[in-house]
Amino acid sequence: MKNAARQKDIILLTIDCWRYDSPSRMPRLQAFTEDYDRAEATCQAAATNGVFPSILASTYYPEAYNDSGALHRDVRSLPEVLSDQKYATAGVIGSNPYLGKWSDRFDVFWNDGMNAAEESTNRSEYTNVHRMWNLLRLRPRVTAGEVASRGRKWFQHTSSPKFLWMHLMDLHGPYHPGLRRGLETGLFDAFYSIVQHSRHGRDAPSEVLETIRSLYWECVSKLDEQIAKVLEFIPEDAIVVIMADHGEELYHGFIGHARLYDECVRVPLFVKNAPQNMDNQLVRQLDLAPSLLDWIDVPQPNDWEGMPHSSDREQASYMINHSPLFGGTFTGIRVKNHKLIKYPNKDEPAESEIYDLIEDPAERNPLSDSSVKEELEDRLNKFLQQNNINHESLTHQTGIGGKTKRRLRELGYL
């Protein structure tokens, strides 16, 4: 089966902030993907900057970036491996300042003007007038429709085999679901809550936070209305992967993505035309790129951390997320039935919590004492020590320059 799939086109669609429970509210997506395998993925981080080295290069992000925030030149990425196999490659990104660093790994790359290898040199002609105009229309900066249009144009004018990566930002805060859906929430409440949340974050009044949560779900419904435009041009025999880069925390006292609850690090995964059955599997993002290469019978680079997914093998999912907003680094380990999360605690030793994911899937009640906690804490500490991962090194690797900070603030990272 692998040889028959060797020259198949490959489409990777990633959706920013797409929660694991979102597909149940997306009937059009469900209908369009009726013949897809439906799985879930575990993320190696809780935010865009941390997850894409695992998705595109099967590498934990502290090993992927230099101190300026750029990719190390020797990081071997999926599009580069496919290019060596005579694939044409393109990335179409719905405006994310953290993803410009991948631009030189693709033949063609569009990211709303943010294509520089280092975030600090990224520019985008987007003024306060544009920002206010889109707020008044409750419209995202780049819509799924625009990403689809650019992706379709490249795809239809490029010879096979080809690899297309599209990244949608429609679910990312600030949540702009369009005027029609804003009316359902109440336009005044929508505008007021977006402004208040941007100013005060989790300290905003409870009614503001409730409106913000409602706007997120309206954005999910809005994206569902557009999803056919994103997928309709893809040929029937192509290998297709639809996955979130990370989820979105809504119900643990914070709205956004930084901490390692399953709201952020367990995400939907839809797969079409894979040579193996992926239904109901739980796949590490670290193993996605090796799996894609395995499906087309191409060996993976020796220095990749992951391996082709196998339902017969349980792999621990390690997680690392440095959050400028929280001023610290969250780390964790997720196994089949349990998850351990270590929280930054300023100058004090990190605190940890462990959850039983079977009895407490919403992660509301950390176990008070557990032999499993000690075992997982030992495994996590060994992983961090072996990979020389610490708070100081991750702080330097953010690579955020002044020209990028405005966009990052707009997206809620700072």
Placement of each model-derived feature along the sequence:
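Catalytic domains that recognize anionic headgroups
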Residues: 1-414
